Amino acid sequence: MATNIGMMDSAYFVGRNEILTWINDRLHLNLSRVEEAASGAVQCQMLDMTFPGVVPMHKVNFDAKNEYDMIQNYKVLQDVFNKLKITKPLEINRLVKGRPLDNLEFLQWLKRFCDSINGGIMNENYNPVERRSRNGKERSVKGSNKIPKSLQTNNNHPPPNSSSVGLSKASGPKSAKAAEVQALSKELVDLKISTDLLEKERDFYFSKLRDVEILCQTPELDDLPIVVAVKKILYATDANESALEDAQEYLNQSLGVEDDEAEGNGEQLEEEKTQA
């Protein structure tokens, strides 16, 4: 099993759209953002599909909204990791915050891991809706494929008579509608291409930042002033706009202290030579 996947592995260059399509197709969901999977329930069910019977799905809360409930899901996931001897660390405190990049990175790893089992072939007998149900009633998973009540209500209405159908078909120029649909389809394709390119570029630079972070966490470099300054920028919150200024100020102060110490040591050596 490919549990140890390096940051430069091709798995971490899989775009957001591909990840969402993978989740939605396999679990019959309709997620539109990766952060919607921050509760950990999706990850639990992905492993339930990959390793039938290993995940206690009755303990997985698909309605988790607060951090406490989400953490309980991740505890279930951690237990499953332990059973399967998966060494991937779960950064629960970061995942439950719902930050897109943190969740995207974990889902990229999960997809790579699941694809490495049985060649990524899906279990055809697996019913995702039934597995995440409680007492025969589907849980209210955000983004699940349900029929809106308005459509259900409309289905109960008697069908229109043939004369009204004929009138509706005759109304409006078909050619104009066809041209409009074609134009919108082309615009949609162009937008998708642009989005995919932007996602690849974003993921590329994210992987670079991740490499810098790993380098900064090296014990031999951890206390160097330049490394501390870089960490101040890497770990700055979104609201902190002066991260660069703070890092520069810290670096200047640290280097200033070192220069003063070096100058003091030089003067002391010069004085000792004079006395000698």
Swiss-Prot record:
Tissue: Highly expressed in guard cells of leaf stomata, pollen grains and pollen tubes. Expressed in young roots.
One GO term describing the cellular component: phragmoplast
Keyword Chaperone: no
One annotated GO molecular function: microtubule binding
Biased composition (Acidic residues): 257-270
Keyword Cell division tagged: yes
Protein localization: Cytoplasm, Cytoskeleton, Spindle pole; Cytoplasm, Cytoskeleton, Phragmoplast
Keyword tags: Cell cycle, Cell division, Cytoplasm, Cytoskeleton, Host-virus interaction, Microtubule, Mitosis
Matching Pfam families: CH, EB1
InterPro entries, sorted: CH_dom, CH_dom_sf, EB1_C, EB1_C_sf, MAPRE
Predominant subcellular localization, coarse grouping: cytoplasm
Disruption phenotype: No visible phenotype under normal growth conditions.
Domain Calponin-homology (CH): residue ranges: 13-115
Protein family membership: Belongs to the MAPRE family.
Subunit structure and binding partners: Homodimer and heterodimer with EB1B. Interacts with tobamovirus movement protein.
Miscellaneous remark of the record: Plant microtubules behave differently from those of other eukaryotes in mitosis: they lack centrosomes and spindles are barrel-shaped with unfocused poles and no astral microtubules.
Comment block on domains: Composed of two functionally independent domains. The N-terminal domain forms a hydrophobic cleft involved in microtubule binding and the C-terminal is involved in protein binding. In Arabidopsis thaliana, EB1A and EB1B possess an acidic C-terminal tail that has autoinhibitory function, but EB1C has a tail region with patches of basic amino acid residues required for nuclear targeting.
Protein name: Microtubule-associated protein RP/EB family member 1A
Annotated source species: Arabidopsis thaliana (Mouse-ear cress)
Taxonomy of the source species: Eukaryota, Viridiplantae, Streptophyta, Embryophyta, Tracheophyta
